[in-house]
């Protein structure tokens, strides 16, 4: 199930029992902490929830003439099950954004395959992050909604 949050307060609050079993993405980082960090003004957080648990999430931020998809993560226990693909596809469909960009490391072949399957294509052989820094080891991809 897709959950769209325009503010960190829109995210479901964990119960006390869940606090002891928070998802970890990488050592020491809880999933809720990941979702709520860097919530920029006009940012959007999309979460895929399965059986009452967050299993994948992404953030979208206004960028250039569209949005920048960043922070796409799937909990390690749920990787390889198609949740991230479902999340990206559902978010693109639900939000009806004209253009969505994504920066992907050239070494991240699973993410490149996911983005390509969701209709993204490569437009630049570098990435310019929100802070203006340029990363030559990542490429920029774009999704252009054919219905807009």
Predicted regions and their residues:
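C-terminal "cap" of GNAT-fold acetyltransferases
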Residues: 128-148
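Acetyl-CoA-dependent GNAT
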Residues: 5-9, 13-71, 75-77, 88
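Conserved acetyl-CoA-binding loop-helix of GNAT-fold acetyltransferases
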Residues: 74, 80-94, 113, 117
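Conserved active-site alpha-helix within GNAT-family acetyltransferase domains
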Residues: 106-124
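Conserved GNAT acetyl-CoA-binding A-motif
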Residues: 95-106
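A generic structural signal for beta-strand entry/edge sites
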Residues: 64-66, 99, 140
